[in-house]
């Protein structure tokens, strides 16, 4: 993964700009997997998306050969720069104009595409915030 992505309406973008050591994480991988598993849990339990799997080398959550959630992080002094994005109900045609994440022939999908249901980004965000119980409300803010 890496290189280039697209952010737009109908997509949830999560930038957890915190020093992960202050929250008990012992490694970058543990921090990234915690967030990925929280997102996976909400997409499965709340949205009904099935067969989600995390791929380290492709930096995201996948359903077979289709990418639904992305991570792009660089860490500076144990604080992540950038974060995660999740396709909820966004227009996927924008991805056809780029090579998403530097992966040729990458198929991009969304919650809407996978389930046929339209979820509000705010509702999914609220569920993800609830899934991340170790953080207090002052750390995670929504726009």
Regions found by a protein language model. Give the residues of each.
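Catalytic beta-strand/loop module used to bind and position nucleotide/cofactor moieties
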Residues: 1, 6-9, 16-143
